[in-house]
Amino acid sequence: MKKIDEILNGVSCMAIAGHVRPDGDCIGSCLGLYQYLRDNRPEIQADVYLEDPRPEFSYLPGFSEVKTSCEEKAYDLVVLLDVSSEERIGVAAPLLAKAGKTICIDHHVTNTEYCEINHVEPDASSACEVLFGLLEEEKISEPCAEALYTGIVTDSGVFQYSSTSPHTMRVAAALMEKGVPFTRIIEDAFFKKTYVQNQIMGRTLRE
């Protein structure tokens, strides 16, 4: 697949969307691409569609602008991030039929290649890691890097899962060099979530 910048030529309006019950990688990749467009292609009118994004990711730039219900309009381009199949598309599912072009950027080996263009890297830790390789690194701002780092951290289990590779670490290092507050991101995006999950599990076991 070409770099995102090449694909955007001729695009005036586009939608960015993720899967049902979006996690950190889904939210991070969607908002990372959204921020990249705001920074480098402000002439493109872009909308992000996510189904009830979790509040622990509200620190991410662009979070408040996410649309949680679908506006059935015809976009020049619809980009699906971290969505392995058409059945997994969230609120944006109706947009595909009217889109001028559809692209899926994903890392799941189960991806069904349901879009016109499908860029899938099963060995990647996350959709954010895949997306990083499709962006012009020198054009990635700190807010964009913050979103991408969030996705990598959550889907790699803070670099503990087997999907973590040397390439994952190099991408994370490149994002850190953009100035991301990595300690806060790890705390907010991963450990706070884990703490809450443990509390819920504890209450369930007591009951």
Identify the residue ranges that each predicted region occupies.
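A structured phosphate/pyrophosphate-recognition subdomain
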Residues: 1-17, 32-38, 112-207
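Anionic-ligand anchoring segments at beta-strand to alpha-helix junctions in alpha/beta enzyme folds, i.e.
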Residues: 14-74
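Short, glycine/acidic-enriched loop or turn micro-motifs at the edges of active sites
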Residues: 22, 26, 83-85, 109, ...
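Divalent metal-coordination and catalytic microenvironments
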Residues: 23, 33, 57, 79, ...
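Conserved strand-to-helix beginnings and helix N-cap segments that scaffold or border functional pockets
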Residues: 27-31, 90, 165
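Short, glycine- and charge-enriched coil/turn segments that flank and shape catalytic ligand pockets
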Residues: 42-45, 71-74, 98-101, 137-142
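Generic beta-sheet signal
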Residues: 49-51, 81, 105-107, 122, ...
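Active-site cofactor/cluster-binding pocket
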Residues: 61-117
